């Protein structure tokens, strides 16, 4: 299905947030996920279904000053 990930249109096979993270090779838990501007707690990643056209933001911490 076609979704937007971090502002970029992508064709993905995943149907849930947790599967998308695996598909995109994100590991660990040092990031936050928002679907259609709704930040999801990690406890909901496995149950949150994705739909065509969803906008997903994967937010990772950055070091800087």
Descriptions of predicted regions:
Residues 1-64:
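Ubiquitin-like/PB1-type beta-grasp interaction modules and other compact soluble beta-rich domains
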